[in-house]
Structure formats: structure tokens, C-alpha cells
Amino acid sequence: HTYNSKSEYFVYKNLEDRKCYCFDDIDLKILEGEYFVMATSTYKTEILRTSGLKMLEKTFYVDMQYNVVPMTKGETFTYYQLDIYRYFIGRKEQSMNMDNFVRNQEHHKKMIKWLIEYYTHISSKLSSNKREYIEIILTYTLNTHYSIYCEYDKNHARAYKEIVDFDQYLLKVNKALYERINCMAYIRYNRKTKFKFVRLNGRKWNTAMKMARRLKGKF
């Protein structure tokens, strides 16, 4: 990717160039947080067809559907260390900019609810490795969603209502995912305090919480 006119070459350092891997046999730890996203992945047409992938229309962040849905049908993957895709980051107009996350929060909510319900429906049909992989991807996405409301949305009354409603929704639809993200200190803290600090001033209170955690240990 390129940021401030400086380029960084992204590689999956623990994967061998041109080697074919069986997804169910690999130890996911070798990926070290370097997962397969739209900018670094391509699928055979047949896999896209059999997966039934149909992206939400007129919606931001649907790349997350591409990151998850075809993965349920793929059995093997081959890594090619090629410089094909150039991604420019840090631009204000990007949908990944946090201000735009806040502005487009309804898009993000629509997308992540779709993913949660999709995964809940098909998870029992997946291998344990695929379930773990997809849950890792969903955990990253859920972290972003909670951050939008707990830290960045300056409309605190709206943020409070949205995150309380979403948290209850997640508990109802997929308790395992709900419990999985409880490992994140700021989510656990906000749940314990019933998100009241989001209503007051989310970012300041969550920053204070993170500082307190460093000094005094886990909440």
C-alpha cells in the first residue's frame, strides 16, 4: 500500500511462494494477523458461483462479504508473491477513514448484521478451521463497529442507543460471537457499565479506561 507517498510491500511472510495449502490443515497462527482480504485475494469463478455471493447494493464495506462468503467453499489456496494491487491509504475521502465510518455507520451496521446472520446460518456446516478463521475476521469487524459508537461518534445520545441495541442484538443472534469479543477490554468495560460512558462522552472515557488498564491491570 501507499501512504504519504511511501510504499510498503505486503507479504504473507510465513507462506511459501507458489505453494498450495489445504485450508483445513493449516495452523492459522502462521498467518500472524495477515488474513485474506479483497486487496490480496482472488477466487476461481466457480467458487464465487457456488458460494452464492451476492453483495449488498449501494452499500459501503461490502468487501467484508467478499472476505468471508467465498471462503466457505474454497478447500485449497495457493500463495503468489506478486505485486499486483496498489492501495492508497490515508485519504480523507476513503470509506475506511474513521470520520467516514461514523458518517456511514448505517452502511456498516447493515453489512455486519448481514455477516452475523449469514455466519450463524452456515457455521454448523463448516470445518473447525473455517469457523475459527471466519470468527477471527468477524471479530476484527465487530471491533470496528463497537469503536464507531464507543469512541468516535460525537453524537453521544445516538451512539449510546445504537450500541446498546446492537449489543443486545448480537447476544440474541450469536452468543458465541458476543462472548468472544468480550476479551477486548473496552467492550468488556462498557458492558459492565451498561455503556453509560458512551452516553456521556465516549472517546474521552474510553481513553481514560485504556490508560487505567495499563496502570492497574485488567478490569
Where on the chain are the PLM-derived regions?
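Donor-binding/catalytic cores of nucleotide-activated saccharide
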Residues: 1-80, 87-103
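Generic detector of well-ordered alpha-helical segments enriched in charged/polar residues
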Residues: 27-28, 116, 135, 164-167, ...
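Gram-positive cell-envelope targeting signals
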Residues: 38-39, 53, 71-74, 79-80, ...
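Catalytic core of nucleotide-sugar-dependent glycosyltransferases
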Residues: 82-91, 97-126, 144-174
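Short, surface-exposed acidic
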Residues: 125-131, 178-182
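Amphipathic alpha-helical repeat scaffolds of TPR domains
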Residues: 132-148
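Membrane-interface aromatic/basic loop that binds lipid-linked glycans or pyrophosphate carriers
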Residues: 150-219
